[in-house]
């Protein structure tokens, strides 16, 4: 549950940072506009990091190499996508399309493994890919 709690703090920070009334920065409260996609990206990144870490503890780590690599790539692009959406970047749609592509690859790889962490990651990647595709459309 610690992972979800950290997600809540990140989302609170995004909301606070984009809507603080006394901020001298340009007001770009894009968080509500992209809320479901940002949440999906952050949940996916969290699941990917957990999966990659757990895969390193598996007996046959060589068999998990592709999974670990895709988990790390997916987590990286998910964090980047969430950040760009929270900033209201004009590049957010393009990056979200790339994020969706990587999430689908990670979903496919993780689905091959029967471990709980891989199955959880596959589900999170599917949700994120679908949200990013909607956002990028």
Report the location of each language-model feature.
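Amphipathic alpha-helical hairpins
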Residues: 16-137
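N-terminal amphipathic/basic-hydrophobic helices that include classical n-h-c signal peptides
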Residues: 1-24
């Amino acid at each position: 549950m610690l992972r979800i709690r950290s997600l809540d703090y990140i989302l609170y920070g995004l909301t606070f940072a984009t809507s603080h009334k006394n901020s001298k920065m340009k007001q770009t409260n894009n968080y509500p506009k992209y809320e479901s996609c940002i949440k999906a990206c952050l949940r996916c990144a969290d699941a990917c990091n957990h999966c990659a870490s757990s895969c390193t503890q598996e007996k046959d780590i060589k068999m998990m190499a592709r999974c670990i690599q895709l988990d790390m790539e997916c987590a990286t692009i998910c964090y980047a996508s969430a950040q760009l959406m929270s900033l209201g970047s004009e590049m957010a749609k393009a990056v979200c399309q790339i994020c969706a592509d990587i999430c689908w690859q990670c979903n496919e790889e993780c689905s091959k493994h029967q471990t709980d962490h891989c199955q959880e990651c596959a589900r999170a990647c599917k949700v994120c890919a679908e949200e990013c595709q909607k956002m990028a459309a």
